[in-house]
């Protein structure tokens, strides 16, 4: 049976200048210079070396594969002086059989390249392309008779559920390395009890009274196990989680899950952390999911590339509906078509079994660089669309259009559904334009599903204003923007899904704004995940039900205005504000409560909503605090 041995420790990293460092994986060489601004982080080729002993295996009956789960962006793998493989694409799994190359002591060298080129995506985008081996590396030992390991990094098993009334048919396809042998398939429920069994490499399991995977309310998972036997002996086994669900998109009613309206409201997520980059661990993934669940999101756009398998597993487990995509972004590369195809094939093959995924993203803001290579770009999208629908007819395709991509741009009408990255009220003045834009789409294309793939505004927890303005990067303007957008979406319930950009601040080394270069500050949570901005609680007030109350503006501690506005976010219907122990006012409402407060020299604020309380202290001052504002710069928008 298969065995996995991680090889994560005691690698020798050789930087481009020849400097050697012994370290443990995961690792990126851009953890610091990719986050400090200047658009000057080092991109090129570095190498990683590892000495390891031959794993225990039976050379007559077993094989050993070398497996990588994420090397950005291109890799050349050399073992004992022999080239094993190359791989272009920094976000997916790849593996190769190294059995015949192994020796008693093995010298592994991985050349990793994130340099600028015209063939491997991404090359131009508003995030840092960290170089390194930033996910797990493993030795995988299997029987020579095994479930397939050589097809686009996939698991060798494909599970396709189909709901039939209260029952379900679950088709299980497997591929094996040998024609002989028998495959037995077993479906287990969440308690590990056998529900159905079948045999063969293409079998259908019939399940009566099926328990549906029903989003965040009830993300029920079965497990499919496939066992390969040769001459009566079990030689290999693979398994996959199976969530049985059905869904649809309607231009007039939005998204449906299991036959019921299911309003998709959620966030986008980048995978990097402050000081760590993309070299993150399971604990980091767990933290992200914990925070996303806290605000009540039910969908995640995993931007702009394939994420770690562990995070897709978390989405399955917690019922998050997922938009998965490849990094075909910002600019069509003259020689990049083949790479978009290979990355899409890997994305689908490696993630097909995840019930959380409902849509495959073809591209993001691909028209942002203008009309260059427009014909080639459109044709490549048509090729991708056709290929994806052939590989997976059970899901829909989508893409994210750039704000300046007009409604009737041809690329916006290739995928099954579409969404827009719109920052009206941030990069462009006028909150009202969001409603106008959505209504115009409805007039022009009443039968085409529309979503917002990105919307947001920068918000720095250290910048504040009593009169926030577009572009000032204050926490107060970010609040104002998101307060409007949440009400805007309520006016357009037919939209298929809307995604905050972004759940977390993330690195974009070309940026310089808000006094902290190298960062995109649109997150609801800071880059280190330690501080929840005010608007985090705004979304929690809209998307959750458990009673809580939050006093916004607590970091706007020193204020010059004689009468200041106090904002409170709560799931409760009635909120009372107290200052220095005296009741100021009680208000009834939903989600957002605004109070006018006559400032005293020192103000000990307390808000009460049922049994929930929160407090803060603010002060009246004569002069504005200089640290509450940041100097204007030219590169606030990376484009």
Region locations from a protein language model:
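Secreted/periplasmic carbohydrate-active enzymes, especially glycoside hydrolases
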Residues: 1-306, 312-314, 318-322, 343-346, ...
